């Protein structure tokens, strides 16, 4: 059985401002230490369902539950916690930590946006797979679609946006 430990999520979610006495007292009472950086690689659901003739049981087994919980709780508390879901950022983050000793708030916010997009795309892949495999029952009320950025473009959008086609 898998279990999500409240103390672990609490370590990510705690508000660290000294004037938030309630959070500080709860952390001390439960022996919770704050976490500054969370790195999560979700179960390979999309890679699993891309295999020919994948069994439903294999697909279901590769739906991550605890990982998205960790990602979302860290992303929500980006004022204090950095969340990394993309291994391409590892070297850049290590460089920042060596130089500054921490990740700057604007970078943590950018990582949080990427993390929420990552879990949304992950959940979209699950819904789309299940909708194609299990044809009976109610249809989800929302239509979900997720696209990966293919490249940056120089022209094609409003001045304050960054144009990029999606695949």
Where are these regions (language model features)?
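Solvent-exposed alpha-helices and their adjacent loops that cap or buttress functional pockets
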Residues: 7, 27-33, 52-53, 63-64, ...
């Amino acid at each position: 059985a898998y279990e999500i430990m409240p103390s672990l999520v609490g370590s990510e979610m705690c508000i660290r401002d000294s004037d938030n006495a309630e959070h500080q007292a709860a952390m001390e009472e439960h022996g919770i230490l704050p976490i500054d950086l969370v790195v999560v690689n979700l179960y390979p659901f999309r890679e699993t369902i891309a295999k020919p003739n994948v069994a439903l049981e294999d697909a279901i087994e590769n739906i991550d539950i605890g990982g998205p919980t960790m990602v979302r709780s860290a992303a929500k508390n980006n004022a204090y916690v950095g969340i990394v879901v993309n291994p391409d950022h590892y070297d850049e983050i290590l460089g920042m930590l060596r130089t500054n000793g921490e990740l700057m708030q604007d970078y943590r916010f950018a990582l949080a946006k990427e993390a929420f997009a990552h879990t949304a795309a992950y959940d979209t892949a699950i819904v789309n797979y299940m909708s194609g495999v299990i044809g009976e029952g109610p249809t989800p009320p929302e239509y979900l679609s997720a696209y990966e950025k293919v490249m940056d473009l120089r022209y094609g959008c409003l001045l304050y946006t960054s144009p990029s086609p999606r695949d």
